[in-house]
Every structure is written in structure tokens, then in C-alpha cells.
Amino acid sequence: MATPRGQTVWFGNEFPNDDLKDLFRRLHQHSKDRRFRLLSVFLEESTAILKEEVANLPQQLQELVPHFDTACTLPEVDFRQGPLGAAMESALLTILELGMLIGHYEAEDIEWDLDPSRTILAGLSIGILAGAAVALSSSLADVAKVGAESVRVSFRLGVYVADISTKLEAPQSDGTLQSWAHVVTGMSHEAVQEELSQYNAVTQNPEITKVFVSAADKTSVSVTGPPSRIKAAFQHSPSLRYSKSLPLPVYDGLCHAAHLYSQDDIEIVINSAKSVIPTSRPVRLPLISSQTGKPFAAKTAGELFLEIGTELLTGTIFLDTVTAGILEHVKLQEPTGNYEIVSFRMSQVLNGILTAIETDFPELGRARRDMVSWVHGDYGARRPSSYAASKLAIVGMACRLPGGANDPELFWELLEQGRDTLTTVPPDRFDLNTHYDPTGKTENATQTPFGNFIDRPGYFDAGFFNMSPREAEQTDPMHRLALVTAYEAMEMAGMVPGRTPSTRPNRIGTFYGQASDDWRELNASQNISTYAVPGGERAFANGRINYFFKFSGPSYNIDTACSSGLAAVQAACSALWAGEADTVIAGGLNVITDPDNYAGLGNGHFLSKTGQCKVWDKDADGYCRADGIGSVVIKRLEDAEADNDNILAVILGARTNHSAEAVSITHPHAGAQKANYRQVLHQAGVNPLDVSYVELHGTGTQAGDAVESESVSDVFAPSTPRRRPDQRLYLGAVKSNIGHGEAAAGITSLLKALLVFQKNMIPKHIGIKTEINPIIPKDLERRHVGLAMENTPWPRPAGKKRLAVVNSFGAHGGNTTVLLEDAPERVKVSTQDDRTTHPVVISAKSKKSLQANIEKLLSWLDQNPDANLGDLSYTLCARRMHHSMRFGAAASGIAALQKTLRSWLDNPKASAELRAIPNDTPSVVLTFTGQGAYYSGMGRELLAEFSYFRTEVFQLDQIAQRLGFPSVVPVIDGSIDDGPASPVLTQLSVTVLEIALARFWSHLGIRISAVIGHSLGEYAAFAVAGVISATEALYLVGRRAQLTEERCTQGSHSMLSVRASEDDIEELIAGSPDTAELAYEVCCRNTPQDTVIGGTQESIDSIRQALEKNTIKCTQLDVPFAFHTAQMDPILDSLETLATPITFKAPSIPVLSPLLGSVVFDRKSIHAQYLRRATRETVDFVAAIEAAQDFGLVDAKTIWIDVGPHPICASLVRGIDSSASVISSCRRNEDNLATMSKSLVTLHLAGLTPCWAEYFRPREQEYSLLKLPTYSWNETDYWIPYIGTWTLDKALLKYGEKKAPLSLSMSRPSALRTSLVHQITTETVEATTATLHVLSDMQHPDFLEALHGHRMNNCGVATSSIWSDMAFTVGEYLYRRLVPQAKDVHMNLSDLEVLHAQVALEKKGSVQPLVLKAHLNLSTSSMSLAWFNASAETGECAAESFATCVVRFEDPAAWTREWDRLSHLVLGRIEALEQRAVEGKASKLSKPLAYTLFKNVVDYADRYRGMDQVVLYEHEAVAEVTLVAERHGTWHTPPHWIDSVSHLAGLVMNGSNASNTRDYFYVTPGCSSFRLLNPLKAGGKYRSYVRMFPLPEEANMYAGDVYILEGEQIVGMVGHIRFRRVPRLLMDRFFSPAAASHTEKQLQETAPSATNVKKSTPPPAEAPISVPVAPGNPVAIPLPTASKSQVATPPLTPPSQEDSPGESAVITPATSDRGDSTDAGVVGQCLKVMARETGLEVDALTPDASFVQLGIDSLMSLVLSEKFRAELGIEIKSSLFLECPTIGEMTAWLEEYC
């Protein structure tokens, strides 16, 4: 910009005509950029000063000022209203003018150019205060500092003037504004003054209320005074009344009133400036007084502000004098050149001044500089001035949402198709049959059956996340899926912790919203175990993510009810803006299992009873619950761009507030919502009319829809200013599709908004099922706002960004809003990719996952055949976390890669032979090749591609040149021909290359364990190991080469590589007369069968001929001299002399010495004489490597990297050890990058993960992060079902009242009483249902006798026949209550499961109560039963049953038909068995012998011994049975009769030689059915037949059918009776005499432990009816049980499949038997305990498996150490699991010390 001859800077007293809000928004936005640092400082200081001044106001005035984070947001409200209007207007004008001035200089990047010799400042009224700040400044930084104080004075002046003025005339009562000044035109100043003087004299108004002239010029006069006085004055004076006059926008009082203000007033206003601005600060630029037209006389800041204050309060403005002053300044400037006017837009006053200049100086050039126009400019990518100024980028997302939306793409498909995921509560959550009552009469039952649920909530890859199955099962599914989606979101983001500064683990935090604890409170609480706290407490959801990924940033779990998910995102954003983290993972979690929450929300009238959320529908009646898990990865925009991330959208602002003024805590509040929107808009500096999409909270409630529609329309589509037709605002509400995810609702809405940005489409709204709700504002269409009722394109305008808002409100009153904009448009750098070969790596933590990952990638490639291989390589290598199971390849094209992938998948051995990388990374040895590998261009591609390598080479080359040697770069980059080169150039270029390569390998993250150099290569090895410096190495190599050239003759000697050992060569040469006298020397022992010899050319030629005649391969080396021979003798002394001054240091990396044949660690072994000897003596490569092997420095896993132009040393290593892993750095006739790719893949597969980020860094901005398929999880279902109806049962205990103590006196008569059924406690009979609760005492004589009739381990143990009789008894009783006319009742006792053995107490006189609960439903002809232990002291019933079954009432004719079809088969097997007995092939047992065999496990009382004779063959048997004649009590079917006809199965399992009865015993957990065609007869004769077989799907389990025959007819059957094999050593544990406290203990240990037993589901409580959910889609909803005055126990459901840890007596242990091999020794027993307690298979406990990988953490370590002590008698500390981190180390310790 040319410097003007003179200039005036004009500070007006009016705002520009631009959109004032827009100007301040733009100022605010620019201030966040580092380019505008001083603008940012000025605005921050001005904001701070205004806040300080407001805080000093009286309370009633403070309340008039809205909250503001920056002064730039104050224009968003009508700041001119109220008593502070003048103060705000004055301050904002000062801020705007000074902010625009500062911003102009920073935007244009120009120096401060206001020269006092040619610049004058001028202005009017408040504008003079802005001018004062410039007048006192010598730099732009001064303007920022002093300007803030000018803002203070402006504000104080406005406050003071308004305060004084209201004392002169009160404001209007209706709040309307009245002007305190009018401008009159067409009259002179004198004429106006005369009229006013006359008026003031006639009316005799007090002096201070008079009307006066405040400003005048040639054409106009400003008349000022109290509004009523002005009105009266104009009415009094005909001249004024008929003059041309207009009111001015002066609404807050009087200035320029000498009659009103005194020096004291001026001091009060100006005094504040003195405290900050030194009064001695000099005035640097002249500032014209608007009263005198001359510069203020002040010399210092204090004087200047006082003079300005005096003028503003008491002086009259004379525009003509101001113009004259400016003209005088113009006149003083040089007559040639331009005169510049600097202003803030144009005004009428300024136009007049310009006209005057043009008139008086027509020959003068004129220039204008506008200080406002810059604010509309685009200054490139914003560089935030602070963390708080950053925009935030969302770079990854993942989800598990209803309707199978298990990833974002599936979620989008659901939205695009307009699907509704409504369904009923799945059975795995809770049983609607028992927990649903639409009438609301059943306490704690849900009144709605609807919801939206995710698929397979229990499925989880526990091994991936280092969790044991036991821990996984106890861990809340929400927490598990938080882990999973966090990983998937990171995967989408290409986030590798530690890859970049923004992803350092200590700078990564997690923020998740969670509002319920269903799993902890319901499912996991049924068996509170080791992992109850870490598995269920909310904080662990985040803590587990941080711990697993090793993030040490902040970890917050947030509960703000329904807005928790989005509030977590907002908190995460706040952490980024505060600098507490650099990357955050945020989300929301909700998995529904607890019917209590359904009941609570229903009773609170939150939930719809009719189905899905009907957002904006007139019939909206509440929300529908939904599961949901969502995670996003967020970082600052500048970090995301630097990290080459894919940016899904950008967060401009996020805020949360509370509806404190709502009518109730749960009622929304439009005012609070609007305030929150405005705060977000202010934070971002965004015009609400620029927002084109709002994702509503939209729950579908009458209140919620009404309030949100009002708040959104008022802020984003107000009536005025109204949106244009092309500015339509679209609305959406995802809850219409997938319900209300509660804590996950906000994150779900955010995910939808991100997809809308990605897909450029707004999916259709499906929430209006009937018609739009009439409560919605009627004029929305006129405001150009509405729901997208069809899939609506949402294109991104060219060169612009779309804006969207996401809302989420909490039921507790919280409101969270996030403002989003488009990601920056990315222009991909398009350059030629010189990398012809790319590494491709894929990994997983299991073979199954790896194979699936490869299959997914192959499928993706098939669908994307044009994918860029470089992008794919970059994504898979640099932007993926790598795991232990690995696949890798170096590919030259997509087609070649596809072929490789298919080949791997088609090769079954590939997966079978795959092994995880070792926990300990292999050692790495660098081998440095000698000069024989030299060729031109040996590092060409590396030099061109990698700046790090290039820098290393250039620096080393510079050193070489400074040492006086030629440049080696032309050799390395191939710019010279590949012809003969001097020894100096050859040897230096090889050395430079090798040192640079070694450092490059380190740069790629490869840690070097040792180095070895071959001949010349030793110098590079020494430099890399730190023995000598790189400079010293180059100096020695160069000088040695020069000495060789000077003192040795090229071609006189040569070197020969011979494929034979040294001894073989000597024998052949010595044995031939032609060669015996020839002299040669051994130069190198490269391998046992590879030797290099040297000597004179003649001798070597002859020796070669002799050797080749003996078919020995020989190769003449292309070297000019014979190193390591006598030819080197002339240089040795000089070489040693050159090396003597060098200080040789101890190596930082061990050196393998081919000269010494040892490993060098010290500083004394390598010295000048070493170099002399190494030049002359043999290179014994073999000895060096063998020494390293002996020392343990290298082993079979060691990776050998050949560092040289060609892998010569690599072939030598292979010659010594054929199994060695060797890789190359460079290879002759192969592109360096192809070689490097292959080598890096080899290292990666060996477990030495390269620093892929560095490998791709040179071209990172050219590559794109691809959106590849997600990780393939190796999932198992970890789900603890909710068992029973205890959430309903607890309603029986009102307000903490205890149940009455259990009465066991049996004094009250009972309608039903037998030997086992003692007292009815509850009985409810309806038309088609009946419920019965029975109390019995197992210590009752009849019951106790039945127990002792079946003794195990000297204990009376309840046999299944006891539960069968009780079931038949209750079943017939209840059936006859409902069907009194029934003649015979035929019952099928089905699905009997006994989970805990009932052992008789030993103590006589004790009480051992149990409760039987039964519910019969005639509509299903079934009755569900469950047995519970009860407390003898309190009567409290255990939470979980110990046995369950279902009795089905069936037609016996069907049984007969079934059995008739089978009878010939059964009879045929009986006949075959009896024939085998005749033939002596089967055992025929008498009664005594049979029951003697039975004593192996069970000792039966005589009445139970009904089998007279048994024929037994392996697992098949038939028995003759005679029942005892006595019933011995009151029964339906005596247990001893049932046992007699059925316990043949037990004899087969526990007495057959086909069973291992020495080590095991067999017990039954139940059967699938038990039917009797007719009642058993006293003394009756029967036959029993059974054949048992192992169950293939369940280890250690056997099953069979027991047929009961009377004659030739089948009259009964026990179907699918099961027996489990249990180690005999556990007999004492499971069947020990019970203590008196046994029942109380069982009440606490009620978890089932019959592992892997599939539980059957009881029949529904009532017949279903059809309830419409959506058109054409009826859903069966069961009716609830009717409520009675006496609350009946709800129907029973079967118990959980979960295993108990084994503390309580059980029928089947939670262990897996692997045969005798694992029983032997302490180690085997310990492994069994580990397997049982963790839920792992013993096979998984391999020696190399680490406890971390197995999920054995500190808690499990404590458990295992206690189990070892209690069960095995082994005392070990839990810390042993840290000291011995793998199974192998642990077993070694156990073998050594136990």
C-alpha cells in the first residue's frame, strides 16, 4: 500500500448500516484465529472490563444485563432498551470501531502506519473515545490495551448520563423509547437558540431541565432536552413547530449540557481510567475536538480523557469547526499525492467533510480506506488462538442401535428406508407374561409391553479385551458395548494411540452418559460375585476403556437423565476447549433389562401405552423406550487436519443449561431451551438463520413437542427477521424410528446428524401417524420451517458450509445443544505415487477374527476394485491398532493383493500354523556388508522418498566433503554411471549408506540389539554402536582407501569366494602337485562352507582352476585389492597412526567382533591396533555369530537385518543357521521401496511392529484414510437372565414392613396336607388360573424319613422323587379346584431342574423350611412350580429357587399312542439284554448285589429297594421291580415307589463297568418329562428299561429314557433323564452334613450352578390376545394375572443358567473334566481351579498365555489364591500372578515350590 501524504482517521458516533449482529459475529469468529491475536486480546480485555463494570452496578441494573461470554454477543439482544441502553450502545460502538481497526491491520498484515506528522484523528461524540485510544498508542498492541479502557469510560459515561437523566424525567411507563434530541434543518443556530431561550424564559423551567442546542453546523441544529420539554418547546414556537425536524435515536439522556454537569461529574466518569492507564502516557497523535475544531491540548492520557469527558458532558458539537480543523490539516500536507480518509463505512457527516476537501483542494488526490470491509474476508484455514477458540472435529463413530443397526451404515439404511423398530420386550430381558399389566393394578408391573432393542446384547469378545468369561458375564452389557463401540469408533478414526501428539495416551479422555444400572441392580445382583463392583458400577464403564487402551486422560460417567449421551459429548468438548485433553471418546449407553424402570416410567406417565414415539402427532402419548450404544471420537479441528483424519462434521459450540423456571422438575421450559440455543450460537458467532437442520429431542409427548417446537421456531425461524424461501429449516426426530434411547438418545441423535452430513440427505420423518399436533405453531410453513416428510436432499452449497443443531433434553430439566457444521472441504494432494510396492498388514487377537477380517477385506476389495493401494496400505498399516495374530504381504497392486488373500484363505494350513506373536519381541542384529555390494544408485528410491534418510545422507556427505573427500550423493542416488569408481568413493558411499540405513531403521521404530560388520562394514557398525563417531568412521574409511590407492597396486592381488570350508580348501590345494606350492591367505570365514581366500592374481587364478576341477564353486570378487592379505601390509602402520588419536568408547549396542570371535561390551577391546588387525587378519564371521549364540544375545527368533547395498551378510547368516530370519535393506536390481516393504512386513509378522506412521509420513497428506470394514469380533453370549418374579414379589413388603415370622407350628388346619406338603400360606383361585404357595418343613418326621431313605456320603439327600410327589400333589389339588368335575387328572411332570441339593440338617429339633410356589393356567393346561429355601428365623424366602418344573395336564390317550409305537422296540431291547445274560455277555445282578453296587454313591433304605433283579450291559439295563406294599405316609405317589421304578438309570451310571466309578460319581439334575398312565400299585410288579448315552453337545453329561412296563405294556416313562459326571473328590464338598445355618447361607448363595444346562421356559400365565402395533403387524401380548385383595405370588419362571462359584451344595459342579491327565499333580489341580473360576477352558491355559490376556486381574488373583488355599491347601500370595505373568512361569513356580 502506497503511503499517503496525509490522512484523517474518522471515528463516527453511529454504527455502520451493516447487519450489526453479523459484524460482531464476524469479529468474534476472527478473534479466535492466531492471525488476529491483538484483536482477541482487545475483545477479551473489553469483555472483562464490561463484566467488571456491570458487577459494580446496583443489583436491579445487573439483572438487566444478559450473561455474556464475550462482548460480541451483546448485540444479539436489543441492547438499546432499558436504563442501560446508552451505556451498552456507547461501549459497543467503541468496541466495534477499535476492534475493526485492530482487525484491519492484522488482516492485511501491515505495520502500524499512523504517523503523527501526517495523521490527524477526528470524530463525534462517543466516537472520540475510540479516537482517544488510538491517539495514546504508538503501536497496535497499545490500541488493544488502551482501547479496553476507552470501552470502560464509554460504558461509565452512558450509565452516568442515563442515571442523571432519569432524575430529570422518568421513562415512559409502557417502556416505549422517547428521543432526547431532535435535529432541525433550515434554521440557523442563532435562530434556533433564540426560540429556545424564549421558551425557557416564558415557561420558567428550572435551568437543569431547559431545552438547549447540543450541536450545530451550517445546515442543521440539534435540539436537546427532556422529551416532554422538547415536545413543549416545539409546540410553543411556531418556527420550530413548522420547521423540518426529526427525532434522533438518543433515548437515554443528555450529553453536551454545560448547565447540567460540572467538573465533579466529569471526574466521577473519567476517574476509572486513571487506575489502568498511566496518567503520564503521552498523547502521540492529534485528536480534533468537536467543539473547537482544534486538537485537544492535552499532553498526557489523564489530561486527554478529562478534556474529552468535559467536551462530551458539557461541550457543544460544531461540525463546521471539525471540518475546518481537518481542512487545516490537509492544507499543511504536501500538495501532491493522495490524501487518505480512514473510516468505518460512510456517513452523512463524513460525506460533508469529503465534499469540503474536494471543494477546497480540487487538485489533491483522494483515497479512502474502509476499516470494516476486511471483516467479510476469508483468511484461509483458521489457526485457533487458544484451545477455547478451536473448532472440534468428529472423526469416528460407532453404534449398536435397535433394528439391527449395529454400525452407522446399517443405521443409515434404517433411516433412509423409514423403518420403525418397535417390538415387544424380548424374553431375554424379562417375561411379559408375568410383568405386564395394562390395567396398572399389578404393582411393579409395566403398563406397556413395547420397546426398541438391540440385537444380541450379551455377545462380547472377552478374550480381545483381556477379560475372563466370568468377568465378562458379570460386566454390564452397556460397559462391554462401550468398549466395543469405542474401539470401532477409534478404528473408523484411524486412531492409533501415540501415533501423533494429539493421540498420546495421557491426553485421551472418555466421557459416557449412563442413566440406569439395570444389569447391576437386576441381572448381576442375583449372584453378587468378585466382579460385582467393577462390572456394574457406572464409573467403570469409562474406567474400563481408559484402562484397556491405557488412556490416562479424564474419565467421566455422566447422568443427566435422557440427555446423558449428548451431555457427555458436551463435557468432552469442554475438556478439549479447556485443554484437559487432546482427543476424547464420548457416547451414551442404555441396555434395558429391569422391569422396575418400566414400571417407574409408566407410573410417572412418561411412556406411551400404544407404541412408538409419535413426534409431533396429535395422538402423541409418551415415549417408547429403547436400547442404544453410541461412541464418537472428537479432537480439535487443527489436530484432525494435521493427523490426516476423515472429518465427519465439525462442532462449533455445545452447551448445557437447566430449566429452572419450569412448572415442574420434569416439565420442559421453552425459555431455557431458547437461552441454550442462543448461548451455543453466540459461542460460535453464528446467525441462527444460517442453521438449516435441527435434530429435535422429539420424544413424542404433548408437553415436550409443544415446548420444543416453540423454542426451535422462535430462535431458528423467528417471525422477524423471517427466513427466505431458499433458507428453509428442516427438522427431524430419530426417536420416531428407533424410540427413546434415554441415556443414549442424545448420542443417537448426534449420529443421525453426522450421517445426514455424510449422505447429504435428511431422512423422512415417520412420527406423524395421524395428523400434525395442533399444539405446534400454525405459521411454521410461513416461516419456512418444518419436518422432512420425505427423504429430502440436503446438498452442500458450493464454497459454503451447512449448519445443523442437535438437541437433547433430560427429564430432570437439563437441556443440551450441539451446533455442527460441515467438515472443511479437503483437496487431496494429487502426485505420482512412486511407491510401486506397498505393505499390507491385517491383525486380530484370535485366528477366527483374523480369518474373518481377511474375508471382510477381500469382500470390500471385490466391491471396490478401483481402491488406491497406497490408501489401503496407509490405512491398514499406519491407521490401525495391531494385534497378536497377524497376516502381512507386500503387494504391487490390488489384483495381486486379492490373489494373495484368497490363497491364504484357501490354504487350511495357513490358519492352522498361525501363531500369535511372542510376548517378548525378538532381538534384532544389524549386519553391515563390506564394499563388495557396491553399485551406483544403491539408495535412489529411499533418498527420493524419505526426508529423514535424505537428511542423514546429506549430513554425512557434507561431513565427508569437509574432510576433503568427494561427494557420495551421486553414487547413492545413481546420478553417475554404474561403472568403476575409485576405492575412496566406493568405500565412503557404502559407509554413508549403511550408517544412514541403520539410523533409518531406528527411525522406523526398530530397536537394535547388536551389530556386526563384515570387513569395511565394521566401520559403519562401530559408528552406529557409538564406539566411534560417524565423522571418525568416515575419516578412517576415506583415509584408509586413499592409503590403499597410494601404496597398493590395483589388480596385483585378488580375492576368491570358495564354496568350501577352510580345511577342505587346504586339503585340495596341498594334495595337488600343481598347487601345493601356491601361496594364499584365508580372508574371510563367512560360513562353515563358505570361505574367501586372497593372494596374488597368479596364485588365485591357479587355485581357482584346481578347485573348479574338483567341482567346487568359486567366484572371483570384483574388488581392486585383496583385503585381509599381505597386500595390506604397506598401509597398516599409517592406518594405526591415523586411528591412535581417536577415543574409542564402550559400545552402546553390543558389537559382534569377527576379528576377536567374541561379543564386545567394553571400551578396551576396540582400538587403533584392532583396526590394524581387522584390515590384515581374517574376518571370522562364523566365530562372531557363534559367540553371540553362546552368550544368549541371539537365538532362533532373532531377526537379522542386512544393512548394505545388497543382502550379502544375510546370505552368510543363513549359511550359518538355515532357519535364521533375515531381511534386507536394499537389493541390487530391486526398487528400494519394494525391498523395504517386504522387510517391514517380515518384521511386523515377527512381532517387531515398525513405526508405520514414520514410514508413511513423507506422503501422509497424499493418502486417504479408507473406511474399511470393522474388526470381526470372536463373540460369545455372556448373559445372566433375570429369573423369577422378585421385582414383583417385593411389592408385598410395603414401606419396609417385615414379613411376619414364619410359623412352623402347623396348628392351623390346611385344606391340603400330606407327608411333604404341610401348610398352604397363599391360595388364589380365579376363573382360569390358580396360585398356591405351600410351606413345608424338611425336618417333619415323614419328610425327614424320605430324605434319609436316600443317603449320600452319610447324609440324607432329597431325591427327585420327593419333588415329583409334591408336584403331583399340588397339581391335582389345584386342577380340581378349577375343574371340580374332573374324574382323572393325568399329569406330565416336565422340565424338572434341580439346581441345589437339599441335605438334611443333622441337628435334632431344628427347623428346615422350604416354600413351593405354583401357578396353574387352564388356558395353557400347565402349571409352573418352583421350590425355595426359607429362613427359619424370619420366614424370608430365598430370592432364587433351587428347583423348578412345569406340570402339564395332558390326554393319556396321546401317551398310549406314542408308547404303542415304541413298545416293540423296547421289548426287543429287553429281550436282547436277557439273551446276553444267558450268553454270559451281560451281568445279571441280584437285589443285594445291585444295591451293594448302588452304595458306591447312594445308600437306599429298604422301602426304596424295589429292584429284584437287574441285567446290566455297559450303559443299558433292564430290571424286575416289586413295589413295597406299604405307603409309609400320605402321598400322591410315594417317593420310594417312584424311585424303585426309575432309579435303574442311576445304577447304570454308577454301577456299570462302562463308567469310571473310581474317580467319578454321577448325579441327576433332572429330566424332561415324567408320566404315569395309571397310579402305581402297592406291591405291584413292573419292569424298568433304560439305555444311557453321552450328550455330544454337553461335556460330561449323559441322558436316557427310563421305560416303565407292566407286563408287555408301557405304563410310564421318565424322559430324557440326565446324569452329570462329577469328580469323586468333590463328594465331601457337595454332600456333607448340613449345619443349622445352612438354610440361611443358601439364601445368600442362590445362584444356580448346573453349568451348561439349558433351562426350559414355563407356559405363559395367560392366553395371549392380539394388540395392534403397526398396520398389519399384530403382536401377541399376554394378559396379566388379575389382582385380588390378597396379593397372589406371580407365576414362576425357571432359574438362571449362571453357574455359582461352588460354595453352596449343588447337584452339578461348575467344572469341566478333561480326563485323568489333568488330575495329576498340583499343577493340574491348579489349572482346573483357574479354569473353573474364570470360566475358561483348561485348553486355553497354555504356557505362553499371559494372565492379562486371560483376564485374570488383581481381583481374580485374590480369588484364585484363596481357592488354592481352601481347596488345595496351597498358600500363595496373589502377587505371584504379577511375578509370574504367564501360565508357563506360574506352573514352573508351582512345580518348584509346591
Curated annotation (Swiss-Prot):
Molecular function via GO: 3-oxoacyl-[acyl-carrier-protein] synthase activity; fatty acid synthase activity; phosphopantetheine binding
Residue span of region N-terminal hotdog fold: 1318-1454
Region (Disordered) location: 428-448, 1637-1719
A Gene Ontology BP annotation from the UniProt entry: secondary metabolic process
Domain Ketosynthase family 3 (KS3) span(s) in chain numbering: 389-822
Catalytic activity, EC: 2.3.1.-
Active site: residue positions: C562, H697, H740, H1350, D1539
Superkingdom in the source lineage: Eukaryota
Annotated Basic and acidic residues bias: 428-440
Region (N-terminal acylcarrier protein transacylase domain (SAT)): 19-256
Region (Product template (PT) domain): 1314-1633
Sites of O-(pantetheine 4'-phosphoryl)serine modification: S1754
SUPFAM superfamilies per the UniProt record, alphabetical: ACP-like, FabD/lysophospholipase-like, Probable ACP-binding domain of malonyl-CoA ACP transacylase, Thiolase-like
Top EC class, one word: transferase
Cofactor: pantetheine 4'-phosphate
Keyword terms of this UniProt record: Acyltransferase, Multifunctional enzyme, Phosphopantetheine, Phosphoprotein, Transferase
Domain notes: Multidomain protein; including a starter unit:ACP transacylase (SAT) that selects the starter unit; a ketosynthase (KS) that catalyzes repeated decarboxylative condensation to elongate the polyketide backbone; a malonyl-CoA:ACP transacylase (MAT) that selects and transfers the extender unit malonyl-CoA; a product template (PT) domain that controls the immediate cyclization regioselectivity of the reactive polyketide backbone; and an acyl-carrier protein (ACP) that serves as the tether of the growing and completed polyketide via its phosphopantetheinyl arm.
Reported function: Non-reducing polyketide synthase; part of the gene cluster that mediates the biosynthesis of neosartoricin, a prenylated anthracenone that exhibits T-cell antiproliferative activity, suggestive of a physiological role as an immunosuppressive agent. The non-reducing polyketide synthase nscA probably synthesizes and cyclizes the decaketide backbone. The hydrolase nscB then mediates the product release through hydrolysis followed by spontaneous decarboxylation. The prenyltransferase nscD catalyzes the addition of the dimethylallyl group to the aromatic C5.
Protein name: Non-reducing polyketide synthase nscA
Organism: Aspergillus fumigatus (strain ATCC MYA-4609 / CBS 101355 / FGSC A1100 / Af293) (Neosartorya fumigata)
Gene: nscA
